[in-house]
């Protein structure tokens, strides 16, 4: 019955091939670990006038967040490995972020318990070297 009432040929209820497939999240489709749905919800709730947010926008923002997180964690892990410890602390995050020029310009926040970067003024170093030469 193509034009009248009754059973239709297409549709979700009767198809067997869709019943065997598991649902895939937006994150799984995009190959991401961070949740696209949660990021989209945050974007919708935090925009003024409850503006509409596209699905691709949420995927792009999620991908950027995941990339930046992976970059910071990799550098902080290297800093922790250099100091021969197995746990990443705020100090390692501080050393990683301030050691990378691009991340330093991007993240201008103060990291709690991060400490300061080790740096000795050049004028002080020159005085110490001159004293060693005079003593020798």
Curated annotation (Swiss-Prot):
Record region (Disordered): 1-32
Positions where N6-acetyllysine occurs in the chain: 5, 12
Annotated Gly residues bias: 1-13
Annotated localization: Nucleus; Chromosome
Post-translational events: Acetylated once deposited into chromatin.
GO biological process, one term: nuclear-transcribed mRNA catabolic process, non-stop decay
A Pfam family assignment: Histone_H2A_C
Annotated GO MF terms: chromatin DNA binding; identical protein binding; protein heterodimerization activity; RNA polymerase II cis-regulatory region sequence-specific DNA binding; structural constituent of chromatin
Main subcellular localisation: nucleus
Keyword terms, alphabetized: Acetylation, Activator, Chromatin regulator, Chromosome, DNA-binding, Nucleosome core, Nucleus, Transcription, Transcription regulation
GO CC annotation: euchromatin; nucleosome; nucleus
Family statement: Belongs to the histone H2A family.
Quaternary state and interactors: The nucleosome is a histone octamer containing two molecules each of H2A, H2B, H3 and H4 assembled in one H3-H4 heterotetramer and two H2A-H2B heterodimers. The octamer wraps approximately 147 bp of DNA. H2A or its variant H2A.Z forms a heterodimer with H2B. H2A.Z associates with the vps72/swc2 subunit of the SWR1 chromatin remodeling complex. Also interacts with rbp1/DNA-directed RNA polymerase II largest subunit.
Functional description taken from the UniProt entry: Variant histone H2A which can replace H2A in some nucleosomes. Nucleosomes wrap and compact DNA into chromatin, limiting DNA accessibility to the cellular machineries which require DNA as a template. Histones thereby play a central role in transcription regulation, DNA repair, DNA replication and chromosomal stability. DNA accessibility is regulated via a complex set of post-translational modifications of histones, also called histone code, and nucleosome remodeling.
This protein's name: Histone H2A.Z
Organism of origin: Emericella nidulans (strain FGSC A4 / ATCC 38163 / CBS 112.46 / NRRL 194 / M139) (Aspergillus nidulans)
Gene this protein is translated from: htz1
